[in-house]
Amino acid sequence: RLPPGIAAVTAERGRGKSALAGMLLRQLGGEAIVTAPTRSAVEVLASFAGETLRFMAPDALLASKEKAAWLIVDEAAAIPAPLLRQLVSRFPRTLLTTTVQGYEGTGRGFLLKFCASLPHLQSFTLSAPIRWAAGCPLESAISQLLIFNDEAFRDAPMGEIALEAVNQSCWQTQPALPEAMYQLLSGAHYRTSPLDLRRMMDAPGQAFRCARAGGAVAGAL
C-alpha cells in the first residue's frame, strides 16, 4: 500500500496503464474516485475495475465535497494543469496515468512541468505490456499499421513554409506524406482513433492541406 502522496504511471499507448489502474481500483473497492477528461476515456479501466467504479468528471468533482482514500486520474495530461492541481490537493493518495504517444503524449511535458512541481512524487513507467506478451510481433505490426509513432514531431521543422493541396490518392502514390500528416494530427488532437485514419483514407468529401518547411510536414488540415 502506497503511503499518502501522488504517484504517476506513464506508458506507451496500448501498454495497459488503464488496465493496471482498473486492477488497483478493484482491490481498493469503494475507497477511490475515478476522473478523466471524458467518461468514455475510462472504458478500459472500468472493464478491469468491475462494479467498484465511481466516476466523476473533473469539474463536477472539484465542485463537490466528495471524499475518498484514493483519486485515480486516467489520461491526466489531457486535464488542464490548474484544475488537476486543485484535484490532487483534495485527496490523500492520487494515481495519475498518462501515455507518451499522441495528444496525450503531452505526458512528456506533463512529467517535466506539472509533476516536477509536486513534492515527493513517485514516478513509474509501465514497460511490460498487459495486453501482449513481451516482444510480441503483433504489437509492433499494429503500431506500424495504425501509425502510432509520432516521435518525428518532437522538433519543429525549420525553413520557409510552403502550402499544398493533398489528395486521398496520395495514400497510393506518395504514402509517406499523408502518413506524416496523420502523425502530426494525431499528436496534436485529443483521442485520435484508428477510425480517423480510415476516414482520412477513404471517406468521401475530404479535402486536405499540408504546410511544409524544409521538406518536412509542419502543418496539416
Show which residues each predicted segment covers:
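Pre-Walker A (Motif I) flank of P-loop NTPase domains
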Residues: 2-7, 206-207
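Conserved lysine of the Walker
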Residues: 17
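Conserved RecA-like ASCE ATPase "motif II neighborhood" in helicase/translocase motors
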Residues: 51-89
